[in-house]
Amino acid sequence: EYDLDDIIQGSTPLIMVLENIQDPGNLGTIVRTGEGAGITGVIMSNGTVDIYNPKTIRATMGSIYRVPFCYAENMQAVMQKLKKCKIQTYAAYLEGSSVHDAQNYKEATAFLIGNEGNGLTRELAESADWRIRIPMCGKVESLNAGIASAILMYEAQRQRRN
């Protein structure tokens, strides 16, 4: 069992903040990929699918036992805590004003990922320090939550490696 304080500790945490993710496979993929990318934890809104769902557990391929996670009742309180701890928050948002790879993720970072159908709530997105978007070609409007998370986490890992 972890709590919010466990997840945000450390000098340069890399955190995934998930709002109302519904697909167990997506949640499991985010946790598994997150471990590979070096995240320090996952914070989930109460509206997110149960992490102990059998499909989620299978999709994590064991990462559920190694990546700290917690559920949060009040996402605005989470955002206030992240800001207080000087963790930069980046909302993955279709209307983001900045391209994801134009930011610096070498410092304490939290990525906000929203629900598969609706994305982040406007309230949560607007409470982030930055609203970022992943540029896309063709007529694709958005990416799967697990894929978008992977792109952001590995961009942070790439920057931190160099």
Task: Enumerate the language-model features and the residues they cover.
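Poly-acidic low-complexity segments
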Residues: D23, N74, N104, E141-N144
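Active-site/ligand-binding-proximal alpha/beta "capping" segment
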Residues: Y90-V140
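Structured adenosyl-cofactor binding patch, chiefly the S-adenosyl-L-methionine
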Residues: G36-A37, I51, T56-I64, R122-N162
